[in-house]
A protein has these predicted regions:
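Generic structural signal for well-ordered, non-membrane alpha-helical segments
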Residues: 31-35, 55-59, 124-128, 162, ...
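Gly-rich Lys/Arg/Thr-decorated short loops/hinges at beta-loop-alpha junctions or inter-strand turns
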Residues: 13-19, 41-45, 106-118, 215-229, ...
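Long, well-ordered, tryptophan-enriched scaffold segments
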Residues: 181-241
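Cofactor-binding active-site loop characterized by glycine-rich and histidine/acidic residues
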Residues: 52-172
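A short alpha/beta connector and helix-capping loop motif
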Residues: 159-179, 192-200
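Generic secondary-structure signature for well-ordered alpha-helical cores
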Residues: 36, 40-47, 71-72, 102-105, ...
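N-terminal amphipathic, basic-rich helices that act as targeting or association modules
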Residues: 6-91
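Short, small-residue-biased leader/transition segments that mark boundaries at the very start
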Residues: 1-5
Length: 241
C-alpha cells in the first residue's frame, strides 16, 4: 500500500501511540479526534488489503475507551477476533498496519505470537468468556494482579462455549463487556435474546440510563464531553458486527 506523507502527517495522535500507556497521556477531549484518525487508517488499509471494515469501524470508540480506562498489563479478549484492528493500532502496530492480512504481515485476528497485548488467539465468536475465565483462574492461582476483560456480542452469547464459560464464572473476578448491537450472521433466537430485548425497553432501565446521563453531564468541565463520548460509543457498537 502506498500512503502519501501528507496523509500520514494528519494522524498526529495515532502516530504518538507506541503502546496503550501513551493513550492515557491524551486529554479526554482529544479522544474524538483520535477516533477520526483511527477510522481514516482503517478505511485506507482495508480498501487496499481487504478485511472486515464495518465490524471495526463500529468498535473504534469502544476500543479507545477500554484502553484508556484499563492498565497496560490488563488482558482484553475480543470474542470476534476480526474486530481487533483498532486494538492492534493502539498496541504498537500502527507502523506495520499496512501489512495487515498480507504474507508475513500482521494477522487479521489476535495472535499471541504477534504481540504481548493479544491475550488469546480468538477466531470468530463465543470463545472469549471461557478463555478469559482460564486467564483469571491462572492469575488467581499465581497471585498475580491484572484485570481480565472479555468483549462479547449478543450473537456470540448464544454460542454453547459462551454458556460453558458463564456456568463456571461464579466467584471469579473478571469483566464481560456486552456489545449488545443486535447483530449476528443469522437471526438470534432463544430465551436469552428475548430477555435482552425486554431489558432494552423496560422503564426502569430507561430511567436509569437517563438518570446516569444527567448525573455524569453535571460533572464540571468533563461531564458533557464524557456524555458525548459515551453516546458515540453507543452509536458505534450498533454498527459493529
Amino acid at each position: 500500500r502506498q500512503m502519501c506523507i501528507r496523509d500520514r502527517q494528519k494522524l498526529m495522535f495515532l502516530e504518538s501511540i507506541g503502546d496503550p500507556s501513551d493513550l492515557k497521556k491524551l486529554d479526554i477531549k482529544q479522544l474524538p479526534a483520535l477516533c477520526d484518525e483511527l477510522r481514516k487508517e482503517l478505511i485506507q488499509t482495508v480498501e487496499q488489503n481487504g478485511g472486515h471494515l464495518a465490524s471495526n469501524l463500529g468498535v473504534v470508540e469502544l476500543t479507545v475507551a477500554l484502553h484508556y480506562v484499563f492498565d497496560i498489563r490488563d488482558k482484553i479478549i475480543w470474542d470476534v477476533g476480526h474486530q481487533s484492528y483498532v486494538h492492534k493500532l493502539l498496541t504498537g502496530r500502527f507502523k506495520d498496519f499496512s501489512t495487515l492480512r498480507k504474507k508475513d504481515g500482521l494477522s487479521g485476528f489476535p495472535d499471541i505470537t504477534e504481540s504481548q497485548y493479544d491475550a488469546f488467539g480468538t477466531g470468530h465468536a463465543s470463545t472469549a468468556i471461557s478463555a478469559g475465565l482460564g486467564l483469571a483462574k491462572a492469575r488467581d492461582i499465581k497471585h498475580d494482579d491484572f484485570s481480565v476483560v472479555c468483549v462479547v456480542g449478543d450473537g456470540a452469547l448464544t454460542g454453547g462455549l459462551s454458556y460453558e464459560g458463564l456456568n463456571s464464572i461464579d466467584g471469579t473476578n473478571m469483566l464481560i463487556v456486552f456489545n449488545d448491537n443486535d447483530m449476528s450472521i443469522g437471526k438470534n433466537v432463544g430465551s436469552a435474546t428475548k430477555n435482552l430485548s425486554r431489558v432494552r425497553v423496560r422503564k426502569g432501565y430507561l430511567k436509569f440510563k437517563s438518570g446516569l446521563e444527567k448525573t455524569v453531564g453535571k460533572i464540571p468541565l468533563i461531564g458533557k464531553p464524557i456524555v458525548k463520548f459515551l453516546k458515540s460509543i453507543k452509536r458505534a457498537v450498533k454498527l459493529s458486527c
